[in-house]
């Protein structure tokens, strides 16, 4: 008898749909009744994790990734997605966070407007994703469609008239205090006294860059022996003499500030001299503007931690700065100088 021809097996096509995701997965052909393993998912969707496969776009998950299945007809499998919950971490920097600020979000969350924290005596300056508060990192809201865990830092300023109370309230630790507004001799000396006398021994980086102060009021302030001062930004101060360099940092102004690590001098109108930061043994970073045209030879004697100063001008401009003593025994002469277009040294200064 002739052999009965075998009946060919029916094959079905399985199609994979990203269901709002991105990428492609090739369709496959399978024989009716045969078990096969689903290919590994390679679809992606920003802000979502892959949850498995469904047989309807809005259906529940029927199969996990790489599951073994059989089909009874042509089939489309739809990727199912679970929104990732991202964390929002707040560093209020001494303040108290607002109750309404959420701890997390998903990419589908409606835009979140961040609420201001509170802090007695201080003014809130915004939330930032950078602890150094670069302008580009300021964040007022988290827009819908955002992804990723977020760390937010509160920036604070304090008005000059509130600075003493603000400093008195500081707990143990290191604190950067950015003061704004009109500063007077009386206010600044009060600030210095508060730093010296903080009952918790708080260490203060005093940023006066946002203040305005009269030159003579500035010169009548003494930071000497302020052991709790760890940094200072000296504001732009208008010179009362446009024709001659005058002294910006007089003798003894910072004497005994043995924990002072950072000094940044902002550029001012007019020309200035620096007399001394002698014996500031912890001083590590000094930033000098082009308005400084003369530095005393012994200005940094005893600053044993200082190796390099930063000059906010060119090498050529630095070499026009004058000094009264040019001798290798002075610390200034041995310092490296980082300029905008290269490096120089203290010994490049012109002897007056």
Where do the model's predicted regions map?
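Beta-strand repeat architectures
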Residues: 169-172, 197-199, 301-304
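Structural signature of tandem-repeat unit edges
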Residues: 104-106, 177-183, 201-215, 227-248, ...
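Beta-solenoid repeat scaffold
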Residues: 148, 190-206
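Surface-exposed or flexible loop/turn and strand-edge residues in extracellular/cell-surface modules
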Residues: 11, 25, 40, 66, ...
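Extracellular/surface-exposed low-complexity segments
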Residues: 126-128, 156-158, 318, 322-352
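Core hydrophobic positions of leucine-rich repeats
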Residues: 39-45, 53, 81, 115-119, ...
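N-terminal segments that cap or nucleate solenoid repeat domains
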Residues: 159-195, 351-352
